[in-house]
């Protein structure tokens, strides 16, 4: 029954995100990345992961909903930690190129088959591998990521080869 109430809560979160007015503002993406990373500390430690964080010390000001984008980073980190090989490295990086900021979350673990990648962001999708490894998840975390980024009119890409998987999303730099 606890699992069912968590599922209901996740579905309500999605509904709220889809119907919510975005609070677009200028905010520091570096700060959001650090907050998401800090809130994942216990899960990362429990998996024995090393973190390699390349987050600029200077502010990277972007345009968007701070809370929703922090949720995106958190969900990506949570997924990366969940499917990383215990004791491996988890990477969180933030770079700027022109009008866009790029956030990358990368882990070492099983390679995601190419045919699975387009399905990752579908509601309730769980790969065969994640079904056996992730008993608590619902296949909603990446769907939430996609929903939030679509509201922001931003992109996310996934690469997975030789046991390294990376998710990179864009954010519009503040003017």
PLM segments and residue spans:
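Short conserved segment of the HATPase_c
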Residues: 112-125
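A conserved beta-strand-to-alpha-helix junction within the catalytic ATP-binding
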Residues: 25-41, 52
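Conserved catalytic submotifs in the C-terminal HATPase_c
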Residues: 25, 45, 50-60
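Conserved micro-motifs of the catalytic ATP-binding
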Residues: 18-25, 61-64
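Short helix-loop "hinge" at the ATP-lid/N-box region of the Bergerat-fold HATPase_c
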Residues: 80-81
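Conserved glycine-rich
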Residues: 153-154
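A residue-level detector for a conserved hydrophobic packing site
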Residues: 69-70
